[in-house]
From Swiss-Prot:
GO annotation, biological process: catabolic process
Enzyme's top EC category: oxidoreductase
EC number annotated for this UniProt entry: 1.2.1.10
NCBIfam families attached to this UniProt entry: ac_ald_DH_ac (TIGR03215), PRK08300.1 (NF006157)
Catalytic residues (UniProt): C132
Family: Belongs to the acetaldehyde dehydrogenase family.
Protein name: Acetaldehyde dehydrogenase 2
Molecular function per GO: acetaldehyde dehydrogenase (acetylating) activity; NAD binding
HAMAP family hit by this protein: Ac_ald_DH_ac
Annotated binding of NAD(+), by residue: S13, G14, N15, I16, S163, I164, G165, P166, G167, T168, R169, A170, N171, N274
Keyword Iron among UniProt keywords: no
Keywords from the UniProt entry: Aromatic hydrocarbons catabolism, NAD, Oxidoreductase
Species annotation: Methylibium petroleiphilum (strain ATCC BAA-1232 / LMG 22953 / PM1)
Length: 307
């Protein structure tokens, strides 16, 4: 007998939404059923249809009448920070759990190897995946801050222009605020700053991340190295292309780590590791919730609107 899977909807038919189809198709506990877009001619919707998903070009409102009939329990929002709160409200009201891949940060911020278990233990109906830069760098900042206090963390993510769609470009300010905030709230630094560089080079460059942490005291080098290497292994469990290029390098109280992220090449080529780390983290997060739902330990409940 086939294992029961939790049925999912994907909102947003751009780079991230389309890549997610492939990730969910491989999942043992998730099944992509619907793809929601706003442009009937979009490549993402066409590809979703070719892969056997139901589609609508009428936005979330086109999905709502089908949620109950098709048993949708988890939705992934890969649209924009501007429309996410409304999408979330409409679907939460029907008892659908939202995994938010926009920088809206309506719900708690989630980085799987750092705090996923904590979120699965609480009944949360919206979790936010921060940003691709956040998913790539916060594990490293946390790996340092769990050894000793970090006064300041600064990250620079260099992303291939071809991998950045119109949705991400429209959200660059939110991307910066949400990622900077998450370096503190999830990464454990006292202060944080995130910068994104969109690189137009041809052929496209692989995603690269530079992480700098300023510790309060002299860095405990051996412990930091062990902590960082073990964290990298944890991330590699769901993003195999997550790789240490150099570091940790110590210079006074500064700890620097240089990472690169290659994608699996599901939808965009492997240089778009920023897509992969985002979709893989979202998939890993949804799987954790799906396992709890299937085990009967998590009951999704419709969210009533505040009066």
């Amino acid at each position: 007998m086939a294992t029961k899977k939790i049925r999912c909807a994907l909102i947003g038919s751009g780079n991230i939404g389309t890549d997610l189809i492939y990730k969910l198709k491989r999942s043992a506990v998730l099944e992509p059923v619907w793809m929601v877009g706003i442009d009937a001619a979009s490549e993402g919707l066409q590809r979703a249809r070719d892969l056997g998903l139901k589609t609508t070009a009428e936005g979330v409102d086109g999905l709502l009448p089908h949620v109950k009939a098709d048993g949708i329990q988890i939705a992934f929002d890969a649209t924009s920070a501007y429309v996410h709160p409304e999408n979330s409200r409409k679907l939460n009201a029907l008892g659908v759990l939202m995994v938010d891949l926009t920088p809206a940060a309506v719900g708690p911020l989630c980085v799987p190897p750092v705090n996923l278990r904590e979120h699965a233990a609480k009944l949360e109906m919206n979790v936010n995946m921060i940003s691709c830069a956040g998913q790539a760098t916060i594990p490293i900042v946390y790996a340092v801050s769990r050894v000793q206090p970090v006064d300041y963390a600064e990250i620079v993510a260099s992303l291939a222009s071809k991998s950045i769609g119109p949705g991400t470009r429209a959200n660059l300010d939110e991307f910066t605020y949400t990622t900077s905030d998450a370096l503190v709230r999830v990464g454990g630094a006292r202060r944080g700053k995130a910068l994104a560089v969109i690189n137009p080079a041809e052929p496209p460059m692989i995603m690269r991340n530079t992480i700098n942490c300023l510790t309060d005291d002299e860095p405990q080098q051996a412990r930091i190295i062990d902590s960082v290497l073990s964290m990298i292994e944890e991330v590699q469990q769901y993003v195999p292309g997550y790789k240490l290029v150099n570091g940790p390098v110590f210079d006074g109280r500064r700890v620097s780590v240089f990472m690169q992220v290659a994608g699996l090449g599901d939808y965009l080529p492997t240089y778009a590791g920023n897509l992969d780390i985002m979709t893989a983290a979202a998939c890993r997060t949804a799987e954790m919730f799906a396992e709890e739902i299937l085990a009967g330990t998590l009951q999704l409940t419709p969210v009533k609107e505040a009066a």
